Amino acid sequence: MAVSSHVYPKAQENIAKKAMNLSTDSLKVMLFSAYTFANTHATITDVKGAGTEASGTGYTAGGQALTSVTLSTSGTVTTLTCANPAWSSSTISAAYAVFYDAQGGTDATNLPICYWDLGGTSSSSAGTFTLTINGSGLVTFTAA
C-alpha cells in the first residue's frame, strides 16, 4: 500500500514560534484505526477527537517514543529522521500514524507534527508492526 505523509500546518507555526524543538523534545508516534485530518488540529486532543486510536496486544495508548532522532541541515534542506518505529509481538490494526511532540506531557499540550495515511489498514498478528521511515527522512523543510 502506498503511504502518504502530511505535515500539520500548525506544526510549522509551532516550530517558528519555538513552541516545539524537534532536536531536543520527546517525539512519539501513535497509531489510529480511523482518523479524519483537519488543518485546524493543533493538539493531540484535537487529533484524538477526530479518530480512533489503535489498540491491541503490544500497543500502549499514546504510542511509543521515537528513537535515534536527528535533525540535520544540508544546504537549504533540514531533515528530521528517526529509527523505524516497531511494536514487537503485537496484534495491531492501523490505517494512520500520527507523529507528535510529547514535550507538553498531556494530550491538550502535546503537538502534532505530521501524519501518515497508510493507504488502508495494516495489521500484525502476534508479530512485529513496523512503520518504515523514508530514506529521505520523516519530515523535510526547504528554505528558498
Positions of predicted regions on the chain:
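Small cysteine-rich, disulfide-bonded extracellular modules of the LU/uPAR three-finger superfamily
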Residues: 1-95, 102-144
